[in-house]
Amino acid sequence: SDGSFWLKETASEIFKLFWGNPNYDVTGNGGITGFFQWGDLDFFLLDNRYHRTSNNNFTEPRQMLGRDQIDWLINALSFSQAPFKFIVVGGQVLSTGAVYENYSTYPEERKYLLNKIREAKIEGIVFLDGDRHHTILSKMQENENVYPMYDLTCSPLTSGTNNDDESYNSYGIKETLVNIHNFGILNVSGPAKNRELTIEIFDKDGEELWTKSIKANDLKYK
């Protein structure tokens, strides 16, 4: 669905009744954008449907998140002191493939968001997303003066899978591609000044498929 969905207000109310999120619509502009903390970690929950331009509408400036939501996010990220700042989105963000409902099909807004993150010198960014019916970890580092941003795309556990090879995604780490039913677990450990994120991906029977560790100190500007 997109911003034209005539029942989006009803859908928002149903979401609030079903999910026990601590907050919704923190931007005050509609939708279910939210935020929560877990220990010393911050999670920013974005709504990529409520303000979305139709996939087939190219007659106007296109948006997936909307300027108000992005500007709130940049401000909230700038305030955060968390070693890892998890940005949770319904669709793939860092992938360079302009396919399906990826953020790359909204190139101007995607560029605006990523540029704002870099301009504000926000550290510790990790994107969490899905809706691709396969799993892959992407890593974007434009040059040696910036730290690498990661994007964990993880799906599906119960819906259909596909055989997409993500060959169009120049940031994709190919050995992390999973085309079977799977799920992930994130674990953050270590002392306050040296936190480490461990990503583990399992098949539907609980067998580990791959693991990757990322140090918070490696997600900082030099």
Predicted regions and their residues:
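Metal-dependent phosphoester/phosphodiester hydrolase catalytic core
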Residues: 1-222
